[in-house]
Structures are given as C-alpha cells and as structure tokens.
C-alpha cells in the first residue's frame, strides 16, 4: 500500500485538509512538511537567529484576494518574510492551475536565475491559468468542509495590500501520513 501525505491547516475560521503531492513536487513537499513539523532548520527573520519548532504555527494569512487566492506562510505577516533560504520551482507538466483549491508556492519569480520559494504558499479560489509554469503546485484541498473554510477566508474583508482587516490565524499545521 502506498502512503499518502496530508496537511491539516488549523485556522481560527476552521480546518483545511490538503493532500500533498510528493511524487510531483518532492523538494517542495519535503520543505513544507519539515517546516510544519519543526524538523528543518530555519532563520527567524525578526532576529536573524536560528528558529526552532513548527514554523507555521501562529502565522497569519497575510494576503487575501477575493476571487483569486489566500496566501500565508510569512512569519512576519507582511509578504516578504521567509525561512532564511530559497529554492527552485518544481513545475510538473501534469499539474496546472485548471481547478480551484490548489496549494502552491508563492514566490517573487526568478532572481539571478534562481527560484525564490521559501515558506509562503497560497490556495487558489479560482483557476488562474496565468500562473502555470510560474508557481509550484504541491497539493490540493480534499473535502467540502475544507473548501468551505477556504471560501470563507477568501471573502474576508481586506484593507491595504490585500491584508485582512481582522487576522486569519494559521494556528497549526499537522502532517498526517495515511495508507492509500
């Protein structure tokens, strides 16, 4: 039996369960899982010192664009923080932004020919085909209850910079390994 990997994103508006795609984006999934579990080294962007423990716990969804996506994974909550390192995209030809509720890496494009993925991610609430080939898709929201939570987050009131007026907190990310 094959093992499948899931992430449960516990937010203050409800839980989002996502199936991860390690066969399509192994480095990206490994990075996300290790940050979530606190087993990967990272640098605290506030202090410049080594961080410890689960990276995502207590962060916020700092950017929400209604009809497009919800974005989180920045420990600074401002859109430019990360784990202190970057890595390249893993664009898989079988994965395209052709349906809603896909989990992908947020990035700043290529810099010096290198990828800028770190810890920030987004979940789509539309089918943004213009992102194909630019962002690594590494998971998908799996159940209707989770999709409802994504939709609710996707419609919260926002202010300047698409930041929610009231924080949407990612309280924890739990990784589950299940037999298929």
Regions found by a protein language model. Give the residues of each.
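Cyclophilin-like peptidyl-prolyl cis-trans isomerases
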Residues: 1-180
């Amino acid at each position: 039996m094959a093992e499948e990997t899931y992430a449960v994103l516990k937010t203050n508006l409800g839980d989002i369960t996502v199936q991860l795609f390690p066969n399509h984006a192994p480095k990206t999934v490994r990075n996300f899982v290790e940050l979530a579990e606190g087993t990967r080294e990272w640098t605290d962007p506030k202090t410049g010192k080594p961080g410890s423990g689960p990276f995502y716990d207590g962060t916020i969804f700092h950017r929400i664009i209604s009809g497009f996506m919800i974005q989180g994974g920045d420990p600074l909550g401002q859109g430019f923080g990360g784990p202190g390192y970057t890595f390249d995209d893993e664009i898989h030809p079988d994965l395209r932004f052709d349906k809603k509720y896909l989990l992908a890496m947020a990035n700043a494009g290529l810099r010096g020919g290198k990828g800028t993925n770190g810890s920030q991610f987004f979940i789509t609430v539309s089918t943004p085909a213009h992102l194909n080939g630019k962002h690594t898709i590494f998971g998908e929201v799996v159940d209707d209850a989770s999709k409802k939570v994504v939709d609710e987050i996707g419609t919260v009131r926002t202010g300047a910079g698409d930041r929610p007026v009231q924080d949407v907190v990612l309280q924890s990310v739990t990784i589950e390994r299940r037999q298929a």
